[in-house]
Amino acid sequence: MKKQNWLLLLVILLLPAESMIAKKKTEKSDREIWCEIMYRMATPVLKNMSDGLLKQNMLVELSPTWDGRNKEVTYMECFGRLMAGLAPWLSLPDDDTAEGIQREQLREWALNSYKQAVDPAAPDYLLWRQEGRTLVDAAYIAESFLRGYDALWMPLDSVTKQRYINEFTQLRRVDPSYSNWLLFSATVESFLRKAGAPSDTYRISSSLRKIEEWYVGDGWYSDGPRFAFDYYNSFVIHPMYIEALEVITEAGKREKIGNMPGCNYHEAIRRAQRFGVILERLISPEGTLPVFGRSITYRTGSLQTLALLAWRNWLPVELSNGQVRAAMTAVIRRMFGDGRNFNTAGFLTLGFNGSQPGISDYYTNNGSLYMASLAFLPLGLSADDPFWTDASQSWTSKKAWEGEEFPKDHSYHKK
């Protein structure tokens, strides 16, 4: 009897240890979490579009205040925005890991989808020739080529490439609004320039000089003549400004655009670094972000500038790899961990955290929401990059609210 009791006690004592070992074995790494969510987000779009079935199978959701424009803009928004976020990940070399197999599959679907997008005879030919809105999402497609030039642009056949050049060129018919839209023209023309096609340098240079004029200080640009407090500095302005500058100044080798001073590539990166510091400090200890400004349904797209800094190895000294990864993972898990942001067909649903169509703007459909993919740019870093391998660290607000030492904040001024 005593022997049985001792055995029972031993089993009870060992159970927690075995449970902890099992938990450790099944606990996913931050990168695995990101890959899983990105794959889930991308698969319904690319799998369907690669077969010419996106328009047929996408469960489309429109804002209750939809302004009546052609709802087929949905498909271009969905594809373009997704690819702008996905391009760096798909640019990694193939390998035989579980992630590598998924990545190779997504790239295959993506390359087929790119062909569908510009083939007038294809069922998923996108809405290139109608609606001024087309300029916006053509710019995200162009941005995906800038971000994944060798992996996504170069493998396309010559007919498909020429079709893209033709479609991008005819978008000069669109007169961009006096706002962040100037960067959409600049991005399209910057890609044409990089691809060796005829480009309109004035559309690039005039847009960049205007954005430069709209810099208001401390890492913030005004979205047009009047400042608005929203996330458009992350959705559009910092990333597209830097990427267009990178093309036209040859990554800072040229100090001027034409005969005009200003628009300094390296200074633009420093401003983005300051904005990245601000974004990191906005992430709460619980992994939430403040909900303010228009287009809040773009969810994690608000983190794009921070994601860009991490992917390009431009994080400022104030931010470590471990704290940025931990902070971004906390937001991504909080936003997508329970699946509530996907509809019954697997596409993103209108809302911020769940189905909340009432908060969407008059121009918003659920294709618009694939801006969320822009937070996943660091997946373009290999799995052994320090961003992924450095030890996880508490981010600024978590340290502050837990009573730990944390760095003071300082405004940024050009030196």
Label each residue range with its predicted role.
Residues 23-78, 84, 88, 108-115:
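Low-complexity, Ser/Thr/Pro/Gly-enriched N-terminal "stalk/linker" regions
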Residues 47-70, 120-123, 331-415:
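CBM-like carbohydrate-recognition segments
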Residues 75, 86-89, 103-255, 261-269, ...:
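Aromatic-lined, polymer-binding surfaces characteristic
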Residues 98-99:
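Long, charge-dense tracts
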Residues 263, 267-361, 390-394:
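Non-catalytic carbohydrate-binding regions of carbohydrate-active enzymes
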